[in-house]
Amino acid sequence: MSSLRIAMFLLVVLMVLIDCSTAIPAADKERLLNEVDLVDDDGSIETALINYLFTKQIVKRLRNQLDIGDLQRKRSYWKQCAFNAVSCFGK
């Protein structure tokens, strides 16, 4: 549950940054985008790869958090089984 809160918080922060950056003039917008670096950008392929992999990992975690319908379905199934084993496993 706390990871869902963290993901939602990051999503809200990202939305606020995007909203603020659209209202900022182009020169300030470019400066703001250049200040947000995952790893110090020295132009090397290793740095670009680290940034790519880190971003890919974050996106994967966010996508996994969005698919909670399946988890809720499984949870309700196991609750039913815990309450009435015959309904799950038969006689």
Curated annotation (Swiss-Prot):
Alphabetic keyword roster: Amidation, Cleavage on pair of basic residues, Disulfide bond, Secreted, Signal
Compartmental location: Secreted
- Phosphoprotein as a keyword of this entry, yes or no, is no
Query: In terms of domain of life, where is this protein from?
Result: Eukaryota
Recorded protein name is Prohormone-1
What residue stretch is flagged as signal peptide? 1-23
Return the GO cellular component terms, semicolon-separated.
Answer: extracellular region
User: What's the main place this protein lives?
Assistant: secreted
Q: Which residues carry this modification: Phenylalanine amide?
A: F89
Task: Report disulfide bridges, numbered on this chain.
Answer: C81-C88
Q: Which residues form the pro-region?
A: 24-59, 73
